[in-house]
Amino acid sequence: MNKYSIYVDHTLLKPDASLDEIHNLCEEAEENEFYSVCINPCFIKVAKHYLLETPVKICTVVGFPLGANTTETKVFETRNAIALGADEIDMVININQLKSANREYCLQEINEVKKACSDKVLKVIVETALLDQEQKEFAARIILESDADFIKTSTGFAKEGAKLEDIILWKQILGDAKQIKAAGGIKNLDDFKAFIDAGATRIGTSSAIKILNNQ
């Protein structure tokens, strides 16, 4: 096993992903001992079958990719995903409410979804490409105050993905109280290592095989 494998959420979230591609994703995750596969909810059940009796976790997305669903919808999505077999939930926060610094709304949404997660892991996607510096700091402080397990940079569908300076900023605010997932645009081993060194404990990427083979 590559020493970096355990950091990887092996990701396939494109809207036209096929069953064959999901099968291949799961095989790669098992062979390379990645931490999880990150897939759309419609594939949870089949991925659970492919990964039966392996340690690979199943991560899925909620409120994805815009975050504009109601909290009630996100709670339903979360419960449904876990019933299907998801181990981790990557939920897109309501971006408008976050940018408006609506602390009460953001906290309530995160905590309601975490309650629906029960003992499963909740990562909150804040879409850094749409935030200014003050909003990024606010996002980290909301996560620190909330019941979430992780803050996550990006959906991979915005104009930019993870930036090293954001991981450094969040690590300063969060310390070891919450974990950080860097995702979006991570394509080479040097960047992968830099994000880990800066404090990320999980990397979401669709390029994990190439990255860890240093291609």
UniProtKB/Swiss-Prot annotation:
It catalyses: 2-deoxy-D-ribose 5-phosphate = D-glyceraldehyde 3-phosphate + acetaldehyde. GO terms for molecular function: deoxyribose-phosphate aldolase activity. Its EC number is 4.1.2.4. SUPFAM superfamilies: Aldolase. Gene3D superfamilies: Aldolase class I. Pathway: Carbohydrate degradation; 2-deoxy-D-ribose 1-phosphate degradation; D-glyceraldehyde 3-phosphate and acetaldehyde from 2-deoxy-alpha-D-ribose 1-phosphate: step 2/2. It is found in: Cytoplasm. It holds the Pfam family DeoC. It is an enzyme of class 4 (lyase). The active site is at residues 90, 152, 181. One of its GO terms (biological process) is deoxyribonucleotide catabolic process. Keywords: Cytoplasm, Lyase, Schiff base. Catalyzes a reversible aldol reaction between acetaldehyde and D-glyceraldehyde 3-phosphate to generate 2-deoxy-D-ribose 5-phosphate. This is Deoxyribose-phosphate aldolase. It comes from Ureaplasma urealyticum serovar 10 (strain ATCC 33699 / Western). The lineage of its organism: Bacteria, Bacillati, Mycoplasmatota, Mycoplasmoidales, Mycoplasmoidaceae.
